Swiss-Prot record:
General remark: In plastids the F-type ATPase is also known as CF(1)CF(0).
GO-annotated biological processes: proton motive force-driven ATP synthesis
Cited InterPro entries: ATP_synth_b, ATP_synth_b/b'su_bac/chlpt, ATP_synthase_B_chain
Membrane topology qualifier: Single-pass membrane protein
Protein name: ATP synthase subunit b', chloroplastic
Annotated transit peptide: 1-62
CDD domains registered for this protein in UniProt: ATP-synt_Fo_b
GO cellular component, as recorded: chloroplast thylakoid membrane; proton-transporting ATP synthase complex
Record-stated family: Belongs to the ATPase B chain family.
Function: F(1)F(0) ATP synthase produces ATP from ADP in the presence of a proton or sodium gradient. F-type ATPases consist of two structural domains, F(1) containing the extramembraneous catalytic core and F(0) containing the membrane proton channel, linked together by a central stalk and a peripheral stalk. During catalysis, ATP synthesis in the catalytic domain of F(1) is coupled via a rotary mechanism of the central stalk subunits to proton translocation. Component of the F(0) channel, it forms part of the peripheral stalk, linking F(1) to F(0). The b'-subunit is a diverged and duplicated form of b found in plants and photosynthetic bacteria.
Assigned keywords, A-Z: ATP-binding, CF(0), Chloroplast, Hydrogen ion transport, Ion transport, Membrane, Nucleotide-binding, Plastid, Thylakoid, Transit peptide, Transmembrane, Transmembrane helix, Transport
Localization (cell): Plastid, Chloroplast thylakoid membrane
PANTHER family on file: ATP SYNTHASE SUBUNIT B', CHLOROPLASTIC (PTHR33445:SF2)
């Protein structure tokens, strides 16, 4: 395209008159086709690109001796840019914007539901704390009951063992005291007998104590 636009000035001067008529006919033809296409049918962008490239390839109808040569390149490029923007709007920006809007609405709805569930969560947390407190009190009461029952059982066993041991000790002491008394009586009798024999041997026969 740049090579076509960079043709020598002589070729532009030679083809000045016939080129002046041809672009006008093509422009009129393209303007007649545009309403028929209605710019909504962008399924065939190749046709628009071919027409635009043909217009850009034609030499400009400029007179020799002017400082600047103006042609249809700038309007054609502007038209291509507008067509590209319309095509992107229909095929890219609109679907992507729709998806982003749906995603935004979904996120907002989820955030709203989460905010609405905050009261329910607080209620459930309070209920859980109440249940935990009740369970702790029940467990503590159960432990105290078991501890009291076990302590009572231990006290009963201790008292029974103590009473049994005390009875056995008292019985043993009574038996020992009885044995001691009988032994003392036997010893007293033996002492009296021995004393009598000693006195009998020591004292004369006619003396009695």
């Amino acid at each position: 395209m740049a090579s076509l636009l960079a043709r020598p000035q002589q070729a532009v001067v030679r083809a000045a008159k016939p080129a002046a008529a041809r672009p006008l006919r093509l422009v009129v033809r393209a303007s007649a086709q545009k309403p028929q296409q209605q710019l909504a049918q962008l399924a065939k962008p190749a046709l628009s690109a071919i027409v635009a490239n043909a217009l850009m390839a034609m030499p400009a109808a400029a007179e020799a001796g002017k400082i600047f040569d103006f042609n249809l390149t700038l309007p054609v490029m502007a038209g291509e840019f507008l067509l590209l923007m319309v095509f992107l709007e229909k095929t890219w920006f609109t679907p992507v914007g729709k998806v982003l809007d749906e995603r935004d609405n979904l996120i907002r709805s989820k955030l709203g539901s989460v905010k609405d569930n905050t009261g329910d969560v607080d209620k459930l947390v309070l209920e859980a704390e109440t249940i935990l407190k009740s369970a702790r009190s029940d467990v503590s009461a159960m432990i105290n009951t078991k501890k009291a029952a076990k302590q009572s059982e231990l006290d009963k066993t201790y008292n029974e063992a103590k009473a049994k041991i005390t009875a056995e000790v008292e019985s043993s002491i009574a038996g020992l005291e009885q044995e001691s008394a009988s032994m003392l009586k036997s010893l007293d009798a033996q002492v009296d007998k021995i004393s009598a024999e000693v006195l009998k041997r020591v004292l004369p026969e006619g003396v009695r104590v």
